């Protein structure tokens, strides 16, 4: 009988803790100062990306830090249903098929291969096969040791 009561008390305490934690978390993420609101910050970061030149990895194409920022802006645009931002991000990428083709990073290292997440995400959004064809080689070679690498 005492063992049963012990388990009941543990379950009740756990339930109370979970309920309190959820309520606190919801309140914590709902009370941002105006300038720190996630949507405001996301829009500012995305605008900043669109205003800057490409960040390059020496002479080997677009740097993975830009890829991560670009991907974050794209996911932000999707989650906030900002079709105009998706269009702007896509237009920036379109140049890589033609005028800025020399900025495509070579798939020689995990840092450069990160680039593949962008065309694959754009493929997921648009179903345009050009994005799939560009992104898959980066994904497929991400963990391969390049032929000219020193082990």
Annotate each PLM feature.
Residues 26-95, 129-145:
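Low-complexity, Ser/Thr/Pro/Gly-enriched N-terminal "stalk/linker" regions
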Residues 62-77, 107-124:
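Well-ordered alpha-helical segments within folded domains of soluble proteins
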Residues 83-121:
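Mid-chain, structured segments of secreted extracytoplasmic proteins
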């Amino acid at each position: 009988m005492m063992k049963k009561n012990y388990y009941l008390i543990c379950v009740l305490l756990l339930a109370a803790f979970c309920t309190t934690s959820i309520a606190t978390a919801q309140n914590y993420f709902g009370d941002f100062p105006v300038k720190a609101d996630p949507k405001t910050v996301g829009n500012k970061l995305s605008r900043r990306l669109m205003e800057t030149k490409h960040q390059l990895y020496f002479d080997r194409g677009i740097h993975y830090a830009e890829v991560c920022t670009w991907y974050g802006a794209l996911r932000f645009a999707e989650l906030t249903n900002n079709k105009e931002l998706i269009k702007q991000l896509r237009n920036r990428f379109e140049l890589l098929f033609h005028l800025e083709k020399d900025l495509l990073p070579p798939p020689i290292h995990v840092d450069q291969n990160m680039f593949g997440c962008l065309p694959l995400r754009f493929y997921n959004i648009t179903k345009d096969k050009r994005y799939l064809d560009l992104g898959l080689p980066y994904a497929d070679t991400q963990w391969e040791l390049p032929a000219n690498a020193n082990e």
